[in-house]
Amino acid sequence: MITKASFRILPIFVLVLLTLPSRASAANQAEFDLPRPNGCHPVGTRTIVLRDPRRSRDLLVTMWYPATESASTLAPYMDKKTADALAEEWKLQPNFQRLVLTHARLQAPLAERGPFPVVLLEHGSSVVPAIYTVLAEGLASNGFIVVATNHPPDSLISVFPDGHELKFTPYWPAEADRRTQGVAIGKFADEVLVADVRFVLDQLQEMDSHDRVWHGHLDLSKIGIVGHSMGGTTAALATQKEPRILAGANLDGSTYPGMNADVRPIPVHKPFLFLATEEHASGETRAREYIGSESNTYYVVVSGADHMSFTDAGLVSSRFTRDSKPDNSALERALLTSTLTRSLVEEFFAKYLKAAAAPNLDLIVRVDKK
């Protein structure tokens, strides 16, 4: 681990053969079980709407949490409108979501052995929080309450309970040069995404104090944040700026908003985990990603991964790609990367929010002095 700013991370290439999740169905079966969570808790899930009157902004927030055993309905992977939008974007089979089986129960009672640490989950641009279900269910089964905010207009679509929807809209000037676009993206991250994170944290405090369902279950002295792509940038910014967040993880996002090294890096002075693809790690800005970072920073390069490997995309696409047969080899690769991602993120937050051991994380990450 890094304890002084004079230390630097040595990225290492990781190819780990892990036991495949037991409930991953064979590709020729009709239904497809997402990988089973590996923790001791059953998982529940609820989706709520948080309204910020000051900013005239509504946010859909999905929460996965440790639950008691329940016979309540198994949660759908996503609603039909969201699935239709994703199927169009990713060229998936119509109604694929009906065949994807999750492991969370809708509105299951919360486990009584709380309160539980909180992990905020931040999505990338033009996707939806549901594509991080495997990661979210895994964290929840290991004793974390996961809070995933849908951030319009950065998400692919937000479908609210009353039926109205908001779709992805670019928030950067399309015809501008790369640096100008990067400045616009950084401004959006600061003024919208990090503001959303802070608003959600404020609402969690209210919920823990007064809400009938959540009262006493949220340990808000132990908060982490993990994000992918643009969500990784959000996670880095929020970890830097928000004192309530103790640790963060960035899944192949940039610490340079808009991937522009001349805009500004984001130094992080708290425990932080980077998971990166080989392509990202070999980029010209990679060596400066963590300039100024200190206090237990990890940088892991995942061999063979692509940008979407840190989501459910590889699992879903290998099974439900339109006009092609299921790809068993692609499914196996996706399972390996998904399992590795979940394991390292779970261990990282267990270490820094629960003071637990992190044997796999500490085994594969090494540092040296400059």
Predicted regions and their residues:
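The feature captures the conserved acid-bearing segment of alpha/beta-hydrolase catalytic domains
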Residues: 246-308
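Primarily recognizes the serine-hydrolase "nucleophile elbow" in alpha/beta-hydrolase
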Residues: 199-264
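Alpha/beta-hydrolase active-site loop
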Residues: 159-217
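Bacterial N-terminal signal peptides
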Residues: 10-19
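Domain-level recognition of soluble alpha/beta enzyme cores
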Residues: 27-119, 330-334, 345, 350
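Active-site machinery of serine-nucleophile hydrolases
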Residues: 64-68, 82-85, 130-178, 303, ...
